[in-house]
């Protein structure tokens, strides 16, 4: 889709938190908005991200840069989370303000700013320049509801992890309740990680009250109770899945991939290897762009995959490859497995050879698997991932969750057991059927007149009317 230079109509600026998992969903929303007549979309990413991304392809969305105060080395330049977040607010506020002034001077004033919910300072800047603001929450509705209850003081922190029979029953969450270990780790271990990030995920809830609009990266049919609760409390609208159109409704020409890639995928190798495998035979394994499992854990995953007897494609980032058992990559390369440093995940999940996805349960990966219809084996690491894993196994029934031992390690026997259960167990067909059903619902939600599409249309209508 070519970029239009028409300055008339509505100009929407989208500004993202500087990580790949936050940038691409916002970009995909921008592509959806820009597909409507008379809408100009501009995505603002940090100077560091723009300088270090692999030739971004953003379709009809223009791209500009703002500063997070760490232009040369990104997060590493700050040294710690609190310093980084402080710089992000200080430099981000100043450069966003300058961007809004510059766009107005060019005759294309910004009517609305859609901001990542982590950037709680954006509404102050946007309103100063006469723009409406919409908070975009990249997490599941369920996770947002859990954070909102904690923010309001209805959940006492820490939620005690590891206990059973002590389920929390909270409005907007399943009637069956959540056990302590099902909550995001920021709530179960508020002092065990970074306090700055706990404050960040709770402070984002200000967006429910301060933003003119609240948009959620989910779809109604996936989380109806949670979505209805958010709509009743804050007027929130689901606008996802924010997955490229080629894997959903196919209404946006050439929208076949995300625009920003901080890693280079081994596309040719992955495709050639998958092409040589039978349908539904391959176990795809990826723990995302941030997870850092221990060498002990990596060894158990390796042994479990090997012992399952199933062919596997495993993404192990270059920084993590030293943790693999010595000689493992060469041992399996003959046909049983392929280890790559990064993969074109959407293409891999959509490949007929892939039978299941061993995932860290990051929300983007979860939405991709649901949108494409691939059963999952959940191995959550931190943040919102335990909640997503709970839904994968118990509420959506599209897979199983790996159970760690008392030391927190998922043993090789457990990896083998779960791979066999999802790939060939008595419930394997149910998992695949349920995954296919959610894929159909995701496609319908983003198709013309679907739940998410209708919410996007309604949002634009309100922006046009300055509501």
Language-model segments: which ranges?
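Glycosyltransferase specificity loop/lid
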Residues: 1-467
């Amino acid at each position: 889709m070519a970029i239009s230079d028409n300055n008339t109509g509505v100009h929407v600026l989208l500004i993202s938190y500087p990580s790949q998992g936050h940038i691409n969903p916002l970009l995909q929303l921008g592509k959806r908005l820009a597909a409507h007549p008379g809408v100009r979309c501009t995505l603002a990413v940090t100077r560091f991200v723009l300088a270090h991304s692999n030739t971004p392809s953003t379709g009809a969305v223009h791209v500009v840069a703002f500063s997070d105060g760490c232009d040369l080395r990104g997060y590493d330049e700050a040294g710690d989370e609190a310093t980084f977040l402080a710089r992000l607010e200080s430099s981000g506020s100043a450069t966003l303000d300058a961007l809004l002034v510059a766009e107005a001077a060019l005759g294309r004033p910004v009517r609305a700013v859609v901001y990542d919910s982590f950037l709680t300072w954006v509404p102050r800047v946007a309103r100063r320049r006469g723009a409406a603001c919409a908070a975009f929450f990249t997490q599941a509705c369920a996770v947002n509801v859990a954070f909102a209850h904690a923010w309001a003081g209805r959940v006492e922190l820490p939620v005690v992890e590891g206990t059973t029979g002590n389920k929390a029953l909270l409005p907007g969450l399943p009637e069956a309740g959540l056990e302590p270990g099902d909550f995001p780790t920021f709530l179960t271990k508020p002092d065990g990680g970074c306090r700055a990030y706990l404050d960040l995920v709770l402070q984002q809830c200000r967006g429910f009250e301060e933003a003119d609009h609240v948009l959620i990266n989910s779809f109604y049919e996936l989380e109806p109770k949670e979505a209805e609760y958010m709509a009743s409390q804050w007027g929130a609208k689901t606008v996802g899945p924010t997955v490229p159109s080629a894997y959903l409704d196919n209404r946006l020409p050439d929208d076949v991939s995300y625009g920003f890639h901080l890693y280079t995928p081994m596309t040719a190798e992955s495709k050639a290897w998958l092409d040589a495998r039978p349908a539904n035979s391959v176990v795809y394994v990826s723990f995302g762009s941030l997870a850092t499992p221990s060498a002990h854990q990596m060894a158990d995953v390796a042994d479990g995959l090997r012992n399952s007897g199933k062919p596997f494609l495993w993404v192990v980032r270059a920084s993590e490859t030293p943790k693999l058992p010595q000689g493992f990559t060469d041992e399996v390369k003959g046909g049983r497995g392929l280890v790559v440093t990064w993969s074109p995940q959407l293409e891999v999940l959509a490949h007929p050879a892939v039978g299941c996805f061993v995932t860290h349960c990051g929300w983007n990966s979860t939405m991709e698997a649901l949108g494409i219809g691939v059963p999952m084996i959940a191995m959550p690491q931190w943040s919102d991932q335990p909640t997503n894993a709970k839904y994968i196994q118990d509420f959506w029934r599209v897979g199983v969750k790996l159970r760690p031992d008392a030391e927190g390690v998922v043993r090789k026997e457990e990896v083998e057991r779960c791979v066999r259960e999802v790939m060939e167990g008595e419930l394997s067909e149910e998992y695949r059927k349920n995954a296919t059903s959610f894929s159909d619902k995701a496609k319908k939600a983003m198709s013309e007149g679907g739940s998410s599409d209708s919410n996007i249309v309604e949002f634009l209508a309100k922006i046009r009317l300055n509501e």
